[in-house]
């Protein structure tokens, strides 16, 4: 598949007459078309929401474009929560997923009405003492071991610092329910920047089966399942991009096979994509200052590493 820039050299030459380099430029049309396709891909699920991963591109103007398509914000720090508040996000439009979390960030997230996604079993006691247990609460699951798709190892969750073990998750839900929680979410992130249409459906199957088991063992009402991020983009011109419509239908198929027969056809699906939502539609415009020809070719520009996003 041939990949072409969304802006021509001639257009850039005109733009730099007004805006000095370095700067980022974005394809608004591309962002909107992709957001529309994501919404279409999961239209079969009435409760679906994409929570854009703010860390991927913390630009309020761009996030507001996504909000026009029903997107919320996925935050992992107080700064990201503050940005979300500043652009008008509130309540369950905000998902707060963090680890090694300072107590004051839980307090601030709760003040905004955000859904809190706990990363650690010990955080149950922490938030209970800080803010009490919210009616809606989510927990992050780490299955451990290796995560494979079609016999290909995608990642090693067992080496990751994130999430509850299965045993901790079941016990945690029991404790949270006893302390007043009424609506529960399950979240998991098992691989980064996957370029395959099978990642979300494979992850969904794991989480859907887990949700059924948890419901049967705890009686908890599973309100949503959050597939998090991990849907990637090709970085080379000849790479094949993910087909979000095929991905959405793959998740739909597993949903109908696992959740619906178990009386869980009301579970909402959430995602937290960042790179997939914004990565292909932005570029860094920089000017070459020097070219050095030694054992390798070196190009010196007026940009630096801190300006490179995603």
Model regions and ranges:
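A charged N-terminal "starter" segment
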Residues: 1-116, 121-135, 174, 178-182, ...
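Glycine-rich tight-turn/loop motif centered on a GG-T
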Residues: 20-22, 91-92, 107-115, 151-164, ...
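Conserved, mostly hydrophobic/aromatic
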Residues: 31, 55, 77, 109, ...
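Conserved radical SAM core fold
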Residues: 59, 80-82, 102-105, 143-160, ...
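Short acidic, glycine/serine/threonine-rich loops at helix termini
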Residues: 63, 85-86, 106-108, 127-130, ...
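Non-cysteine beta-strand/loop elements that form the S-adenosyl-L-methionine
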Residues: 76-79, 97-100, 136-152, 183-188, ...
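Conserved anion-binding
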Residues: 120-182
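C-terminal active-site-proximal or functional interface alpha/beta core segments in diverse enzymes
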Residues: 195-308
